[in-house]
Regions:
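Glycine-rich flexible loops
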Residues: 1-188
Length: 188
């Protein structure tokens, strides 16, 4: 997780520290242009990606890298997610893109994400996770939530296609339920 402090600096979480035990003094001030920082703790291994986003998008003030389950499943398939829910389209656009695989924690990953993400607020990373950004942390968290919901819907839709099962007919289900469970009547 990182937050832009000004046009040249971000505060970023350290690598290898449990967020539940994180203290304010553990946060690292880092120059987004040079990646220089002070202190004994190492910054997040995805610092290159965070910095690349801040350098490219001046309106972004918060970046979150995470590994939500549905998004990671889609990213492992190197698929892109159509955003069908209109309430998320204004935040995510019509499609959540997936960046080509690159080794984690490398400039190569940052470049791959930036090529695919462009001005979008979120992007899947093949075989890795997601990156989400926003004007503030609240919006960045909302982007992750919207991405995960969209990925869930996409997976559920595709499981139906893979299984060959159609959506069940609600009217038929009600009829079966009433016939089978209606008190006092024998099952027909």
């Amino acid at each position: 997780i990182s937050v832009r402090v000004d046009q040249n600096n971000m505060i970023i979480t350290p690598s290898g520290i449990d967020y539940a035990r994180l203290k304010e003094e553990d946060l690292i001030l880092m120059d987004i242009n040079t990646l220089e920082y002070e202190g004994d703790l190492k910054p997040s291994s995805e610092k290159d990606l965070h910095a690349a986003i801040y350098c490219a998008q001046k309106d972004i003030n918060a970046v979150i890298h995470s590994h939500p389950s549905y998004c990671c499943s889609v990213a492992a398939a190197h698929a892109e997610v159509p955003v069908k829910d209109t309430k998320w389209q204004s935040l995510l656009g019509q499609t959540i893109k997936t960046a080509k695989y690159a080794l984690p924690s490398t400039v190569g990953l940052a470049n791959s994400v930036m090529r695919k993400k462009k001005d979008a607020k979120g992007c899947l990373m093949a075989n890795h996770g997601v990156i989400a950004c926003g004007k503030d942390l609240d919006q960045a968290f909302e982007v992750i939530y919207a991405m995960e919901e969209s990925a869930r819907e996409y997976i559920e839709e595709n499981v139906k296609k893979i299984s060959g099962k159609e959506e069940f007919d609600v009217e038929s289900m009600i009829e079966i339920f009433v016939r089978k469970y209606n008190k006092g009547n024998k099952e027909r």
